[in-house]
């Protein structure tokens, strides 16, 4: 099937202009349905459930074939809603943030929402607050913050992914750090590991203290001692002006080398995240160690790229 393109007409003076946009009324007339029915379906309104599935399929197919584009400005003015959400991330290209963003995008688009993204690049708290205010001025209906700590409650409904704030009106979405720590350490101990090195998270990360507490409590419950000489805290300090995704891998590599240079024997590493685990793995291999034969490596998050590492 040939790709659809917008029709272009020529005016009397030879200039090109776009053909008139297809309206919701045009779609309704094409299907011999009422505009109200078509509107319910295309806007996925609650009343759409009462419309037969085959009719809904016809509406979506016709909207596609006619290249219908909803007028979001008119829609917003009528409903006094923007159908948009603001998303704040530390760094868009960071593997963890990128995966979370992909999920956010898919769900919002399915629900008929658009989104605006801002990256504060782990800069100052002031910049983060400025971005929240900027997004509010863009009339977004809510905020989603990914691994971003805030100190004041936004005026809009907000969800923080990997957040631990107790601010009123803010919902936190976090993984079960306690269960993750127990499962990881139990598995390593079943493999025979007792001297397990640990990468504690960067001081500026929202998950650092929760994951560290979970590891210590899990270790105590399993009768495992976390050795101070095998514990390193990632600095989170950027190589340049701001922290970048590459810095996370580099830091994991650097701290992996530090572990080897200390000379204290260890047979496994429990890293704060997959990015630092991947960096450390490269350091171990470059240092002549086999992974996992000599050193087992595991990290929090389970990002997609970790499944494609060799070894994995």
Stretch-by-stretch model annotation:
Residues 1-9, 14-19, 23, 80-186, ...:
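Alpha-helical recognition/docking segments in bacterial nutrient-uptake
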Residues 1-80:
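N-terminal helix-turn-helix DNA-binding module of bacterial transcription factors
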Residues 5-6, 253-312:
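Flexible loop/turn connectors
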Residues 108-119, 216-249:
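Short beta-strand elements in bilobed, periplasmic/extracellular small-molecule ligand-binding domains
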Residues 131-132, 139-146, 197-200, 242-244, ...:
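Periplasmic-binding protein-like
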Residues 171-198, 213, 217, 248-260, ...:
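Hydrophobic alpha-helical segments within soluble ligand-binding/sensing domains
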Residues 195, 226-230, 290-297:
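Short acidic capping loops at alpha-helix termini that bridge into adjacent secondary structure
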């Amino acid at each position: 099937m040939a790709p659809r393109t917008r029709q272009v007409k020529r005016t009397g003076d030879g200039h090109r202009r776009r053909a008139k946009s297809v309206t919701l009324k045009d779609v309704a007339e094409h299907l011999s349905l009422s505009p109200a029915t078509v509107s319910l379906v295309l806007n996925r309104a609650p009343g759409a459930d009462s419309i037969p599935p085959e009719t809904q399929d016809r509406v979506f197919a016709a909207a596609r074939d006619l290249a219908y584009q909803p007028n979001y400005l008119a829609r917003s003015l009528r409903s006094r809603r923007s159908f948009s959400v603001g998303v704040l991330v530390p760094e868009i290209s960071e593997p963890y943030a990128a995966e979370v963003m992909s999920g956010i995008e898919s769900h919002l688009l399915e629900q008929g929402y658009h989104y605006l993204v801002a990256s504060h690049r782990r800069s100052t708290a002031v910049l983060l607050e400025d971005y929240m205010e900027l997004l509010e001025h863009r009339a977004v209906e809510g905020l989603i913050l990914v691994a971003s700590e805030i100190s004041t409650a936004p005026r809009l409904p907000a969800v923080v992914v990997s957040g631990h704030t107790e601010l009123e009106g803010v919902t936190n979405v976090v993984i079960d750090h306690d269960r993750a720590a127990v499962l990881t350490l139990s598995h390593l101990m079943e493999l025979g590991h007792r001297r397990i090195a640990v990468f504690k998270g960067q001081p500026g990360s929202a998950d650092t203290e929760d994951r560290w507490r979970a590891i210590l409590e899990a270790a105590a419950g399993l009768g495992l001692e976390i050795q101070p000489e095998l514990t390193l805290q990632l600095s989170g300090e950027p190589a340049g002006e701001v922290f970048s995704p590459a810095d996370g891998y580099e830091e994991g590599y650097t701290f992996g080398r530090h572990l080897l240079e200390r000379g204290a024997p260890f047979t496994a590493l429990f890293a704060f995240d997959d990015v630092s685990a991947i960096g450390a793995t490269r350091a171990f291999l470059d240092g002549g160690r086999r992974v996992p034969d000599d050193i087992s490596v595991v990290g929090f998050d389970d990002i997609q790229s970790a499944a494609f590492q060799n070894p994995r």
